[in-house]
Amino acid sequence: MDINQLSEILKKKFFDTKIIEYLEIEDKSYLHKSHINNDPSKFHIKLKIKSKALENMTRVESNKFIYRLLNKEMKNYIHSLQILFI
């Protein structure tokens, strides 16, 4: 899977929840290419999310929601996930 395919999957999952107003996905994998244990098949993703529903949750609740939503992708394609609420 490449980053474009993964981004499309993530967008679909987030927008299918009907609670996301804005989503930006940024591939930060290039920052880790020189690391000894870097796996090129797993991505370092930064998410910028705007969602009133997630804003009304605690930080722990909103992160749990996102990690449950992306469970399969976290296991198979994402090495690290940075979440910013805007």
Report the location of each language-model feature.
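N-terminal, polar/charged subdomain of small-to-medium soluble alpha/beta proteins
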Residues: 1-86
